[in-house]
């Protein structure tokens, strides 16, 4: 996450040049594939099914083999979270800029979980557990396993960077400051686990500052006096936060551009299928490269035709 933030902020001066290599069809494919992947993988925690798998096809196969037997408490926590995430920003637009709906949803379901299960005992409903020290603040020696984990982290960071870059540069009104803010937020998230990144760029500095101050106070409370209680947050609620956030990040307008011609349809389908059928990090990188080549060739052809 920190690596993706550094890359995103570093790209700010080159925003206009990079925009030429962003394919709307590839953006649609990547965003839709990301939302579908998050939905399939996190449904396991939402319904407390107990499935196993690291990629979409493995998780779907696990659902088929084990059967779809949701736990009522998981459904309850997740559904309450979804209702808050969807209705709170619509009913309280100004307040939602400072107090994130995700924070309210997690607090509400935490209190409900403490009421239904006051004393911790192993159940089908998983809880997030104690929040450990941020990894960037640890200085353990890097061995062979650590090097492999570092390489994997860099690949995932690059994939996340491409997702964020496509998400932001896909909008014509995106400014350089949006990339800088997005990068800084990602760096803060890696340093302060539990911080919430807005799914859409925040344009108003006052709202951003208020949200940061509120988030800092809440994080301090979670880390110090309320740590034993914050560990009881149901993973079902966290799963729904990820699912809703993923679908809110989808640029639905780009889907129309994806069907503008047979070539864009092929590019959209390739981006979608590659990301769904492989590891999401590898799929994102491969799809982004294909999209950049297509967009670059198209841009060069347009320039040659304009010069002629």
What would you call each of these model-derived segments?
Residues 102-121, 157, 187, 191:
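Selective recognition of specific alpha-helical transmembrane segments in multi-pass small-molecule
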Residues 79-92, 124, 157-171:
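Juxtamembrane interface elements at the cytosolic ends of transmembrane helices
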Residues 31-39, 130-143, 155-164, 238-251:
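Hydrophobic transmembrane alpha-helices of secondary-active transporters
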Residues 141-210:
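Membrane-embedded helical hairpins/re-entrant loop segments and their flanking transmembrane helices
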Residues 183-188, 255, 307-308:
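Cytosolic juxtamembrane regulatory segments of multi-pass membrane proteins
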